[in-house]
Amino acid sequence: MRKLFMIIGLDIGGTNIKGVIINNDGTILAKTSVTTGAGIDATENNICHCIETLLELSHINKKEVDAVGIGSAGAIDKQKGMVITSPNIPAWKHYPIVQRVEKITGYTVFLENDANAAVVGELWLGNGKNYKNWIMLTLGTGIGGGAVINGMPYTGNNGSAMEFGHITIDYNGLQCKCGRKGCLECYGSATAVVHFVKSHCTSYPDSSLNPIAQHTMTARHVYDEAKKGDPLALYVFNLIGTYLGIGIADLVNIFNPEAVILGGGLSSASQYFLPQIIHQVQKLSLEGMKENIRYMTTKHGDYTAAIGAAKYALETI
């Protein structure tokens, strides 16, 4: 009888930490979400809080957990267990995340890029297992990406490949946190949704988003108003879809995928921007590349990268 491993998977993004406890049969025993927090101390405290909540929800003893897998935003060095740089978590520059989380939790910890983890999660328990060649974009505070080629995730030389969020849409465009201008994540992320609402609200004086546009508005507010037919919300999602479609059209020309899968928190609003993505891909991608592509969202939504981080740890222990 084979051992049943218990793994915690964490997806640490610029806004939230998503966590799961899962076993090697792929059964999700608990999941939760906490805010990432500002600064290293706050984030480390919230990582501990996330793990404690998962243990409480699953009624699992701390000693029953075999390892923790972390999917981290940004460029990483898996061998050194380090986040090299993460534009949406500025404090994490050459941050030894594996060493730190092992110290504060007592668990063995394994590190993967968050978007690569999302690909692994979707390949294991999601829609990706139905295709051999596909690409994924994770749409959150920023944009991550990943690709499966002939059934295998491609991660590059040191595990940081597929930074789709930093392909250039407009070289004279919006300033990105990475230091460049015109990156896709400036135009197609949850952060971009808020930016575009604020920059276009004067053109829509009757929009219900106007009273909160100058305060703590989030992409969730925009999504909620889009469901009510708010014209500004619908305009912004259409604009987001246009920019995402321009970027994805280039990726289609490079990868010739069977499927394009959207993940991350913003993907829950995909009904309002996916038609425009498809329109742009059909308009801009080359013949022989754009035909017969399936478009879909991740099966497990926001928790796909956490699932993938757990799977990576499971395969590494």
Which positions does each model-derived feature cover?
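ATP-binding/phosphotransfer module of carbohydrate and carboxylate kinases, centering on a glycine-rich
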Residues: 1-67, 77-82, 99-107, 121-131, ...
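Glycine-rich phosphate-binding loop of actin/hexokinase-like ATP-binding domains
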Residues: 129-187
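A charged helix-plus-loop insertion that forms the helical arch/lid used to bind
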Residues: 81-92
